[in-house]
């Protein structure tokens, strides 16, 4: 018959055994599968401990039944084996040789990095010089682990007391699922530890209208963005065209105040023309988006950690973490509310122009002028010659305020 054994560590083991098999022989099989010595195994069936000499059939174990294996503490054996090892631990969780333990952990930069991320208090103590405090923290961590382990064992024991209970089955399923998540996390720590590190975004040094700035390079943003305060500091706010108001969509959304059609930017030693979408975003100064990356043939070279411009005529390095203002790094650490902050907008940013004018009464005469006069009629005639009806041509020209090229593109696009 087939039985399933679940360990206290939530490992699932399936065994094919005879119904007349003794519990001791089952434990021998489990020792091979789990590496837990027979002496430390404690098998439970329906919440009751199984004796080594008992047979499975005598205990009522049937095909597809579930057993639970607990592991008893072998503190004396652990203490003996740890005595010859300076890096060993005492039964209370403290280090046998705290100085050697501290030195060993300090020498592993990857482990220290994980500690600073997962247990900053312990990492700070290891970095310090107070060995007594280190021992106290290690004992506290050991007590916490012991309490959690005991709670888990008690909960599992209650679950397996009635394994056919629906709620118990649901909790067992959740425990198995969590075990898979934990194993995936442990595998990532071993094989992909950089996945837990904070990624430093791409910044380069630029000058906008003669003002030095740290530009955030984001190929996921449709347009190049400048904040209202930054545009004012660069002397460009007076050039903002408010007819280009709209909504910026990304992770969240924010209002587009207008557009600055062209201004000089300096990358390396060269000057380039650049247009900007202006946002009222205090958390983001200047974002170099996909429109200008394409226009100036920029290449993001992550192997060399540089951005090349103009097909390679200029190459500027991406800034190291120490060169990036701390306020930008803080924004990366703490996610902002998408509805109130432009910091969540840039990556994946697209702009949606708002054709609704703020003051219809004052703007209406301008719209009427676009549909009057010989110039407008000449545009209609050109587009009608392309095969479009006069009514659709007039509607398209009015939609784009007399812009013949945009109207033609709209008509051809259906």
Swiss-Prot record:
Residues 374-414 form the UBA domain. It comes from the Eukaryota. The active site is at 218. The keyword Iron does not apply. One of its GO terms (molecular function) is polyubiquitin modification-dependent protein binding. Gene3D superfamilies: Acid Proteases (2.40.70.10), DNA helicase RuvA subunit, C-terminal domain (1.10.8.10), Phosphatidylinositol 3-kinase Catalytic Subunit, Chain A, domain 1 (3.10.20.90). Pfam families: Asp_protease, UBA, ubiquitin. Keywords: Aspartyl protease, Cytoplasm, Hydrolase, Protease, Ubl conjugation pathway. Residues 355-372 have a biased composition (Polar residues). The keyword GTP-binding does not apply. Its EC number is 3.4.23.-. Residues 332-374 are annotated as: Disordered. SMART domains: UBA, UBQ. GO terms for biological process: proteolysis. Receptor of ubiquitinated protein targeted to ubiquitin/proteasome-mediated proteolysis (UPP). Relatively weak affinity for both 'Lys-48'- and 'Lys-63'-linked ubiquitin chains with a slight preference for 'Lys-48-'linked chains of three or more ubiquitin units. Homodimer. Belongs to the DDI1 family. This is Protein DNA-DAMAGE INDUCIBLE 1. It comes from Arabidopsis thaliana.
């Amino acid at each position: 018959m087939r039985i399933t054994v679940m360990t206290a560590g939530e490992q699932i083991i399936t065994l094919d055994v005879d119904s007349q098999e003794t519990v001791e022989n089952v434990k021998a099989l489990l020792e091979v599968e789990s590496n837990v010595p027979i002496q430390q195994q404690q098998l439970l069936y329906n919440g009751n401990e199984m004796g080594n000499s008992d047979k499975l059939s005598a205990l009522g174990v049937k095909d597809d039944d579930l057993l639970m294996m607990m592991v008893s503490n072998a503190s004396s054996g652990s203490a003996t084996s740890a005595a010859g090892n300076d890096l060993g631990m005492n039964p209370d969780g403290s280090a046998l040789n705290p100085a050697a333990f501290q030195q060993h952990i300090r020498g592993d930069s990857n482990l220290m990095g994980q500690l600073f991320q997962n247990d900053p208090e312990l990492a700070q103590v290891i970095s310090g010089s107070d060995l007594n405090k280190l021992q106290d923290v290690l004992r506290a961590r050991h007590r916490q682990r012991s309490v959690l382990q005991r709670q888990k064992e008690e909960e599992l024991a209650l679950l397996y007391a009635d394994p056919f209970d629906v709620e118990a089955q649901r909790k067992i399923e959740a425990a198995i699922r969590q075990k898979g998540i934990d194993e995936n996390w442990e595998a990532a720590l071993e094989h992909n530890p950089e996945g837990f590190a904070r990624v430093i975004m791409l910044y380069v040094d630029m000058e906008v209208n003669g003002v030095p700035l740290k530009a955030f390079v984001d190929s996921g943003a449709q347009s190049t963005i400048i904040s209202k305060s930054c545009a004012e500091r660069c002397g460009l706010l007076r050039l903002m065209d408010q007819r280009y108001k709209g909504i910026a969509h990304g992770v969240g959304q924010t209002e587009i105040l207008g557009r600055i059609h062209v201004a000089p930017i300096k990358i390396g030693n060269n000057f380039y023309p650049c247009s900007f979408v202006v946002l009222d975003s205090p958390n983001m100064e200047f974002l170099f988006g996909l429109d200008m990356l394409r226009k100036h043939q920029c290449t993001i070279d992550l192997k060399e950690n540089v951005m090349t411009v103009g097909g390679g005529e200029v190459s500027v390095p991406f800034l190291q973490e120490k060169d990036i203002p701390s306020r930008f790094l803080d924004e990366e650490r703490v996610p902002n509310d998408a509805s109130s902050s432009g910091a969540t907008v840039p990556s994946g940013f697209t702009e949606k122009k708002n054709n609704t004018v703020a003051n219809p009464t004052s703007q209406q005469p301008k719209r009427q002028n676009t549909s009057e006069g010989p110039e407008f009629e000449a545009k209609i005639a050109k587009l009608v010659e392309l095969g479009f009806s006069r009514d659709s041509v007039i509607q398209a020209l009015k939609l784009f305020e007399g812009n013949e090229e945009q109207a033609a593109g709209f008509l051809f696009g259906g």
